[in-house]
Amino acid sequence: MKKTKIFLCIVWVLVFAGTGSIAWAADAVAGYQTASQQENMDAASEGDNGTGDGLDDDLFDAFEDDASGKSRVADPIYYFNYAMYTINDRLYFYALKPLASGYKAIVPAPARRGVRNFFHNLLFPVRFVNNLLQGKLHQASDEIGIFIVNTTAGVAGFNQVAQKHLNLQTNTEDLGQTLGTYHITEGFYLFLPFFGPSTLRDTLGRAGDYFITPLNYVEPWELEWGLGILDTVNRTSFRIGDYEDLKSASLDPYTAIKNAYIQNRRSQVKR
């Protein structure tokens, strides 16, 4: 049992430390697409006839926006942030990417989509509460309907019946966005160990969302961590290449990630 705990701790560190560098590119961007858009992006990533090249073109527009100073956020702990970025970057390429690539080669795309849908369904409380806090009552109501339909007819959320057959769409919101709608400023930039780019406001939001995320209450903790690793590896398997594309498009990847993250979060707050 002790060896199992040590092994899980090592895997957790290797996997989650690598996710931070790509989280904004994979989930914070693609994760906010509609179900039909997401299917197209998945098809493209699987080599099918889907549309899109992985990263949203709007994301690269963030680099141009920064030239006018629109996305400037203070970075007073630059050396710490850059060190965390470097660590996450290395662990992505040497741990998470190989693991996700092997997983992708073994597990068929339909099964991986089912796993992704399952974890997305689990985040219903976060979406519902934050839609409610933002006064988006219609979207909050839709979240309830989607959760009930997908949990029952969709078999624990593995199938997105509500999105495909009832034309209902989730409206992904988190506490960081909610704080933004209340005009709470972003604060300074942070590159968090394991979680990647953030701001002081988003970090506080992440801490608040922790308490309404069902996965954090799974017992025993080994199962919780195991599910977290599965979720991370599975999500990454759909987005291999996104982070690489961003890095290759910029002479300064650290700044590019910072600017793109900030612009993306601002657009999410405004929508």
Stretch-by-stretch model annotation:
Residues 1-2, 15:
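Compositionally biased, low-complexity segments enriched in small residues
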Residues 2-10:
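Bacterial N-terminal signal peptides that target proteins for export
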Residues 25-134, 227-271:
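N-terminal targeting leaders of membrane proteins
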Residues 116-197:
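Mid-length scaffold segments of soluble, non-membrane domains
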Residues 161-164, 178, 183-270:
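Surface-exposed interaction patches
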